[in-house]
């Protein structure tokens, strides 16, 4: 299942269980600036013992160096058919991204590497789905696997900086 609320996840789990079907994976959107699953879905995932594959760990590209200065002409935010609406690229969100980039640099990572490392460092996350447009992006993103741990002080700074940027474009749970 993908992007269901905690309540709906529990309902689906019960329906599947009544039919002897195991629910293996929940696939929510999750990133440093899209943390809606932390409200209650992570508790449900743990309780039901299902995997969590986070998609959009780079928040549709916002957690890359692409948006550090402005909206590039060739980007998801400039594409009118994209899920990433320009209205989500607010001054507040850009400030958060800029501050996170400074933390990443101190860690010796790019912003995208730190964002992926952070998602994967959460013990309720089984894996992360990354989307790349080039071999270079793939190589850079895979480097995040070389530095998955965070110190307590890094986590404190990141959590203080990375507030939910309200960019969850899948906010509305799927209906069935």
Task: Go through each PLM region and give its residues.
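Structural preference for beta-strand elements that scaffold enzyme active sites
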Residues: 22-27, 49-53, 126-129
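Acyl activation and transfer enzymes in specialized metabolism, enriched
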Residues: 103-117
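Glycine-rich beta-alpha junction loops
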Residues: 5, 30-34, 56-63, 118, ...
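Glycine/proline-rich, positively charged
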Residues: 1-36, 40
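Short helix-capping segments at alpha-helix termini
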Residues: 16-22, 106-108, 148-150
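Aromatic-lined glycan-binding groove of carbohydrate-active enzymes
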Residues: 37-76, 110
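Terminal-tail/helix-coil boundary detector
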Residues: 47, 75-106, 121-125, 133-135, ...
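Conserved, mostly hydrophobic/aromatic
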Residues: 26, 45, 52-55, 100, ...
């Amino acid at each position: 299942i993908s992007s269901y609320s905690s309540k709906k996840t529990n309902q689906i789990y019960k329906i599947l269980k009544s039919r002897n079907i195991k629910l293996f994976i929940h696939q929510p959107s999750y990133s440093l600036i899209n943390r809606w699953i932390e409200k209650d879905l992570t508790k449900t995932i743990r309780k039901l013992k299902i995997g969590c594959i986070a998609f959009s760990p780079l928040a549709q590209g916002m957690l890359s160096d692409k948006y550090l200065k402005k909206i590039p002409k060739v980007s998801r935010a400039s594409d009118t058919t994209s899920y990433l609406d320009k209205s989500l690229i607010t001054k507040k969100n850009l400030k958060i991204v800029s501050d996170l980039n400074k933390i990443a640099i101190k860690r010796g990572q790019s912003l995208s590497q730190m964002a992926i490392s952070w998602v994967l460092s959460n013990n309720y996350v089984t894996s992360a789905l990354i989307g790349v447009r080039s071999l270079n992006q793939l190589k850079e993103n895979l480097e995040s696997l070389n530095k998955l741990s965070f110190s307590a002080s890094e986590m404190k700074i990141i959590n203080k900086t990375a507030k939910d940027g309200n960019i969850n474009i899948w906010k509305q749970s799927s209906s069935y």
